[in-house]
Amino acid sequence: MAEAAPDDVFSDNITFPAADGYTLSATLFLPRGRRRHHAVLISSATAVPRKIYRRFASYLAARGCAVLTYDYRGIGDSRQRAVTGYNQPKSLVGFKATMADWAALDVSAAVAWMRSRYKNLPLNYVGHSFGGQALGLLANNNDVKRALFVAAVAGYWKLMKSPERYRVFVLLNFVGLPLTRLLGYMPGWAGIGEDLPKGVFEQWTRWVMSERYLLDDPDLKAITNFVKYKGELRSLCFSDDLWTLPAIELLCSAFKSATPEVITITPQDAGAKAIGHFGFFRPEHRDTLWRGAAEWLEAEG
């Protein structure tokens, strides 16, 4: 069944293959009765299912964009189902995945799928948190013409505001790692959102504890792909986000062939009490933050 959407938007739940053939679940949002002028791919934050982005995706589609949201492997509807017949998610114990896999296998396939389906439209990209990081790791990232990052950081723990940095340090090292090694996966109930595959959580923890985050990972060969991106790049920083401006600037600094534009937004700018790391996607921002984002994504040149 398609997800609920406004009357001027059609949405359809679909699947497409990752680069290694793994089946990924997605939702395609299309405008009804008007010409499509852009294709937009929305890539999620860590442990966040695609349904969180459906209202923003519908908003873009209503303006004439073909929009795809999707779940990374092991997350949301891209988590395999148990064989019980009750449509319950299968245990993540033994499930093999890392954040590098999400980028190389899942995000790259989503870019390729949209590029193939909408050959005649400019392909733009919205990356929330990890979704922004992932763009730099893609071998095919230069297929993207414009990228809008939303709270996308190189999340070294010491760049976070206090006391958030200490909460994250304890959560990852003294709660998350022991739980992950005991259970075989990181349970969402521990305070991270959705359950995470063991390999994803362990790699994320290593990055968070490294001064330049993923840029310090000697085994991450895909770092060399950052320089391939030559499109427009705008990165949104929210003043009340506990993951801070220096972390955003650190990530942007890796895009050597682009000229990143970092914009800091206060809640007052949006007429809101708070925005933080996740608030951009709340529908209360449709006439403020969303409109500005859409106009930038739809711009030419």
Task: Give short role names for the model-derived ranges.
Residues M1-R32:
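N-terminal cap/lid segment of alpha/beta-hydrolase-fold proteins
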Residues S43-A45, D71, C237:
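The conserved beta1-alpha1 loop
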Residues H37, I42-V48:
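Active-site glycine-rich loops that stabilize anionic/oxyanionic intermediates
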Residues R50-K90:
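Conserved alpha/beta-hydrolase
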